[in-house]
Each structure stands twice: as structure tokens, then as C-alpha cells.
């Protein structure tokens, strides 16, 4: 491609409304342009990258035995009403009425459509397992679209859905898809972790997220220093450290009128924060136990996902207000504790191994110090309630935990029969009776993958694509003052024709621009291999080569250039 015949729309300045690096660089590199809130036009440079990512995903999905289909973006409301999600999905579901007064939605996902398709096309257990996928536009009416294509309203997604006779068959396909996803993100050159995750609004049982590690990520990713263990922070199991020690002092009731928070207690009484506990009051799951106490070490944070999964706790989690707490317990939130507590208590594992600790006395303005389990108060129920912290032991017993920010680019679920049961998607089983199909689903945010790659791989000059396979062009020919030098023009034209004939995705910068502008643009869009042709070097039989990823520069003999590029460039 010649730049003179290309829509090459780079920007020198960073737009003010672009907050994250990927948004800034995608705008500056001429990959995208905003049209409305959360809606983007993809320009030629952007669409080249997007299609290359799609092709890698398609190739690996096909290798894994999945079969490509294409389903409509517009979906009839009846399918969503049948699945039960018409009322449950919320405001992100864009609904509209056609001129025949029929309700439709703009699809945020395709579980209903694929289930309807398969129940019409598949009738026997002999046709299973079946794994169908598509790459299609989705729309979610985000309340606050932000970060460019990282969280836009319209986006491209690869979504796959598998159908099975039983859970064992689903597990086999799930394992295959786990490996397929690992292969995809490895081939894309991304530093990622596959983490245990919550199933969220999609539903189902087992679930893994594929997270690209990047400081701009919205999720906390927990992983071991010495094993493959990785989990979303909401699901990472917290292991108690150490064993409970014998008491060393008598319990004391202390006046603490000005200590209404853990930090104030620690500062005023010179207590180690890890020797304090805090008591949080939440709504209970039943009328008989309308309030429940959750007890954590003073320096630990409550994991709300873990808490609301406890049978005594209301789901969704809801904290009791000050008036409810005062009426039931007789003390304000700054003086709550485990002694003489008149509501059920659940203590975190880390609290269960504490000794000589401080806690509220359930009397306003008072705390107990040197409290010990069994001696001073009976041990309540113990559960995993907290978020893990860096340095915690890994739950698999191998290494310690690290926590980094991550961008979710893929998610796989074992749906079970959530949709097939609701929509009566059955086949004739081996015994001749109707059998409800078991389902899995597997999604990759294709547009988000592009942004995540940039978040993880860039420098002050622009994008550094982690793999030649997804760069918009693999080789840039940059002729210096070509329009003033016949030899430079002749060599550049010949090299361009040769590389094109060899199938190399090459961009030839034939603009009448200063060399500095040409270099800056090629580095900005992230072309991994740059061939710089100058009159003086050419006269000496040499060509300059620059590697965008390593920053390496070297002189290559003119007659060895094609062999060098063939060895170093993945066409």
C-alpha cells in the first residue's frame, strides 16, 4: 500500500478527552474516530488490525473443532421473554419496536438466538456435541461509555456456544476451548492469565476469565508466583496465615470515646492494626435472622461476592443502616464487636487465628482489648470472607500471591441447562426420551483485544504491536527525499513490488514529507520492521533497518536485504 493512495490519518496531538493510552494512540494512529458516545468509525489502519485479530481467532477456533455461523444483530423480544432475560437484563438491553409494532432488541449477546437455532436444527443426541461460533457486532447501552473501544456501546465479539448430552461432554469441550483461548492470546503476543471467575449475568456454573495484565485494567487479577493458580480477586480463596497463639494478657474494657474507626483506634492506642477486628452488619437471608455480623481483621477488606454467597447473608449483599444497628445491638457502628453480640456472627479465617485482639464492646465509646477466643468469647462460624492481599499463601500451597490490574478480553462459561431448559431445547436421547441439552459459551471481545494489546505494548513514540501477525503493516519502506533522488526512487519502487509479490504486507511511504515526519508516523502506527533508504547509504551498497519492537538499528548489504527480511519478517 502506498501512503499517497491510503487514508493515512495520523494526529500529532493527543485529543483531550482520551483518558487511557490505547484510546489516545488509536486516535493518533488514525485507527478510529468517534461518531457518538461509545460509537466509533474504524479507519483503514484500525480495520486492518481488527481483521488480523479476527483471522487469528478464526484459525484457532477452527483448529479446536468449532464451526462458524452468523446470526442477526436484531433479535425478536419473544426469545428474551422465553429465556426470562427480557425483564432481568436491565437498561443495557436496547429495545425497540418495528413498524409492525413488534418488540425487538439489539443483541448484547446471542444465547437466546443460538439456542433457538439449535433446537430447530438438531433433533438427536447423535448430532452432539456441537460447537458453533460467530464474529458479530454487539450493542450494550452502557450508562457511561469510556476508554475508547475498551468500554464502548457497540463492539465486535467472537461468541461461541456448545451443546452436549451431559456435563461430562461439556467439560471436554470446555477444556478444549480453554486451550484454544490460551493459544489465541499466546499467538497474539499478550501477557495474560486465565483466572477463575464469577459467572455474572450470563449464569451457569464454572467460569474462567482471560485477563491481559495492564496497569489501566479495571479488574484485580490474583496469581501465584510459583504455579498456574490465577483467579479474579472476587473468587480468590484467602488462606489464614499462622496458628492461634495462647493468651498473654487479661481482657480489658477500655474507654474509647474518640475512636469510631479502626484507624482512630490504632492511632490513639498505639495498636498494631493486625491486632484489631472490625464488625460489619449486613442484612440476613431470613426474617428470623434479619441482621448478620461479618467480622474481619482490621486491615482486611470484605469480599462482597464471597459474603453474599453465604447462606445466612441476603443476596444481593446489603449493609444495615445506622438506625437498624442501633435498635438491634444497642451501639453505633464504631463500637461493634463479637462480645455479647445478639445477632449471628461469621468470622473470617484470619480472625479465627487471632489472639489478644481488640474489638468494639457493643457499648458506645468502649472497646475490649486482649480478647481471646474460647477464653473470653465462643468461636462463631468461620468462613472465607475477605479479599486476598499480596503475599498471602497461594491456595494451592505453591508460592505466594501477586495482584495486578487486568483487562478482561475473554470469558468462558459452563452454562449447564439455564437456557436450554427455559427454551425447551431438547433432543431425542439414547433411550428415546427428550433430553435437555447442556450448554457452554465462550466469548472474546475482539475490539477490546486490540485496545488491550496497545495498553500492554507501547512507548512514548506510539504503538508496539506484540506480534507481527496483528500489525497493520509488517514492513514500512521509508525513502529519504525520494522525489529528489532517482536512485532512491528506483530502488524503493523495485523493493515495494518485490515485497508485494512475496505476500508481505508492506506500506510504502511515497509522500513528499520530511523524513522525521515519516519515521514518526511509522513508529506511531507500530510497523514492526522499517527499511530506510537513503541516497548516501544506497551508493555504499547499504540499507538501514530499524526494528520497532527492540529499537535495534543495523545496516544491511543491499543485495542481502531480501534474504534478511525473509528471515526476520513474518509475512
UniProtKB/Swiss-Prot annotation:
GO terms for molecular function: aminoacyl-tRNA deacylase activity; ATP binding; proline-tRNA ligase activity. Catalyzes the attachment of proline to tRNA(Pro) in a two-step reaction: proline is first activated by ATP to form Pro-AMP and then transferred to the acceptor end of tRNA(Pro). As ProRS can inadvertently accommodate and process non-cognate amino acids such as alanine and cysteine, to avoid such errors it has two additional distinct editing activities against alanine. One activity is designated as 'pretransfer' editing and involves the tRNA(Pro)-independent hydrolysis of activated Ala-AMP. Keywords: Aminoacyl-tRNA synthetase, ATP-binding, Cytoplasm, Ligase, Nucleotide-binding, Protein biosynthesis. Its main location: cytoplasm. This is Proline--tRNA ligase. Homodimer. It catalyses: tRNA(Pro) + L-proline + ATP = L-prolyl-tRNA(Pro) + AMP + diphosphate. GO terms for biological process: prolyl-tRNA aminoacylation. PANTHER family: MITOCHONDRIAL RIBOSOME PROTEIN L39/PROLYL-TRNA LIGASE FAMILY MEMBER, PROLINE--TRNA LIGASE. InterPro entries: aa-tRNA-synt_IIb (IPR002314), aa-tRNA-synth_II (IPR006195), aa-tRNA-synth_II/BPL/LPL (IPR045864), Anticodon-bd (IPR004154), Anticodon-bd_dom_sf (IPR036621), Pro-tRNA-ligase_IIa (IPR002316), Pro-tRNA-synth_IIa_bac-type (IPR004500), Pro-tRNA-Synthase_IIa_type1 (IPR023717). The keyword ATP-binding applies. Gene3D superfamilies: Anticodon-binding domain (3.40.50.800), Bira Bifunctional Protein, Domain 2 (3.30.930.10). Its EC number is 6.1.1.15. It is found in: Cytoplasm. One of its GO terms (cellular component) is cytosol. Belongs to the class-II aminoacyl-tRNA synthetase family. ProS type 1 subfamily. It holds the Pfam family tRNA_edit. The lineage of its organism: Bacteria, Pseudomonadati, Pseudomonadota, Gammaproteobacteria, Pasteurellales. Consists of three domains: the N-terminal catalytic domain, the editing domain and the C-terminal anticodon-binding domain.
